[in-house]
């Protein structure tokens, strides 16, 4: 935590270098100004950065108002994030509690009633505005991450149930504003072009070399994946506002149950079964040294069995995955791997992060692609037993 006036109060002063102390003090002042100028939350008293995020920067903050302490999450959206995307995310989060889904955080409105603040910034490159949002703080523990996802069987069962509940709750909502992203079936052809360009312009890092070595295999796998499901089939599958990033790191746990679902910044309109494919990719793929990239079929089966127990609510047409969805699901697990690989590759060549760290993500995705190729028939047979 960074308390008011001095980060040194949170730890021995000798542990803070002068430069770090200045940075933390400046950060506190910056966020304190935002909270007081744009929100009616009282006085900011502590700040702690959430180190797990990759795209946006989030902080766990505490405020004091009328003698009462309250906790929130403050998010600084990455520069270049389209405001209509933010509006879509916030409209979805507003819709969920109105439909009875109480596991998601609430968006805290600004003094002028907006769901986010636009904070003017001045940089050497020019002036622009940073979008800031504040969310209610969810109870529970952060136990896992997307690259350390192997929760217990009981937690895995509950995760599938919560995803099914989320889908059943939001089905029928048609979105808000003018925001529209390509569906995964439209993204795959774009990935082929982008990956070719990255290979052509790559450097000599461990990431570049591994990507170049496996690029032909990846591109061929992508092109083959475009054959099914066809657009005609895909268009008939149930569409809804998918979470788009449903993994154990975006869940809070209290005792043995899920107490919160957060990070809706990847939400978009797409098929329900793509969201399920993404969840299976995240929850059921090993990151262990001797089995990295293996899809753990016992976990896949447990996840699907738990998801399929959902029943359609009165007036809803959703429910368990249908036969056409199950027939498409293995293809969408592969597409989910490609989707995350596309993020990994794009993030590396855009922001130039640690090459070894991102090479690990890349290797994981390549290994899963190969596992899927070698075990395709058995995976398809398993999934189709859930009809």
Predicted segments with their positions:
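A cross-family kinase active-site recognition segment
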Residues: 146-212, 239
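ATP-binding pocket architecture of kinase catalytic cores
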Residues: 68-177
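An alpha-helical support segment within catalytic cores of ATP-dependent transferases
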Residues: 27-38, 195-244
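Active-site activation/catalytic loop segments of kinase-like enzymes and analogous catalytic loops
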Residues: 273-316, 334-352
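ATP/Mg2+ or Mg2+-diphosphate-binding catalytic cores
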Residues: 19, 339-387
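Active-site acidic catalytic loop and adjacent metal/ATP-binding pocket
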Residues: 51-64, 68-73, 107, 226-274
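Conserved NTP-binding catalytic cores of kinases and kinase-like/nucleotidyltransferase enzymes
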Residues: 1-114, 257, 384-387
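A glycine-centered beta->alpha junction motif in the catalytic cores
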Residues: 113, 134-148, 197-204, 338-355
């Amino acid at each position: 935590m960074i308390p008011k006036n001095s980060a040194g109060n949170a730890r021995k002063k000798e542990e803070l270098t002068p430069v770090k102390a200045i940075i933390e003090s400046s950060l506190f002042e910056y966020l304190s100004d935002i909270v007081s100028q744009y929100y009616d939350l009282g006085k900011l008293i502590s700040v702690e950065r959430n180190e797990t995020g990759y795209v946006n920067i989030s902080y766990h903050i505490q405020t004091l108002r009328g003698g009462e302490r309250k906790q929130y999450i403050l998010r600084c959206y990455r520069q270049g994030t389209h405001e209509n995307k933010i509006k879509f995310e916030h409209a979805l989060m507003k819709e969920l509690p109105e439909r009875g889904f109480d596991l998601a955080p609430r968006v805290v409105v600004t003094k002028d009633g907006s769901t986010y603040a636009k904070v003017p910034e001045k940089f050497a490159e020019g002036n622009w505005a940073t979008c800031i949002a504040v969310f209610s703080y969810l109870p529970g523990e952060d136990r896992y991450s997307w690259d350390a996802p192997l929760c217990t069987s009981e937690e895995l069962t509950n995760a599938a149930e919560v995803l099914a509940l989320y889908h059943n709750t939001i089905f029928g909502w048609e979105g808000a504003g003018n925001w529209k992203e390509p569906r995964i079936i439209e993204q795959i052809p774009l990935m082929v072009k982008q990956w070719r360009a990255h290979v052509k312009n790559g450097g000599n890092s461990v990431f570049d070399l591994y990507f170049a070595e496996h690029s032909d295999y990846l591109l061929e796998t992508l092109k083959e994946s475009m054959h099914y499901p066809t657009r005609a089939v895909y268009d008939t599958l149930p569409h809804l506002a998918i979470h788009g990033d449903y993994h154990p790191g975006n869940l809070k746990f209290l005792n043995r149950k899920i107490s919160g679902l957060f990070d809706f910044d990847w939400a978009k309109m797409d098929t329900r079964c793509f969201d399920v494919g993404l969840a299976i990719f995240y929850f059921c793929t090993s990151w262990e040294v001797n089995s990295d990239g293996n899809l753990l079929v016992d976990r896949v089966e447990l996840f699907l069995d738990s998801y399929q127990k959902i029943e359609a609510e009165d007036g809803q047409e959703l429910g368990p995955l249908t036969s056409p969805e199950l027939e498409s699901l293995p293809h969408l697990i592969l597409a989910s791997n490609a989707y995350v690989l596309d993020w990994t590759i794009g993030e590396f060549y855009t922001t130039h992060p640690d090459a070894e760290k991102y090479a690990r993500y890349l290797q994981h995705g390549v290994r899963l692609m190969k596992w899927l190729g070698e075990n395709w028939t058995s995976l398809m047979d398993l999934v189709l037993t859930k009809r």
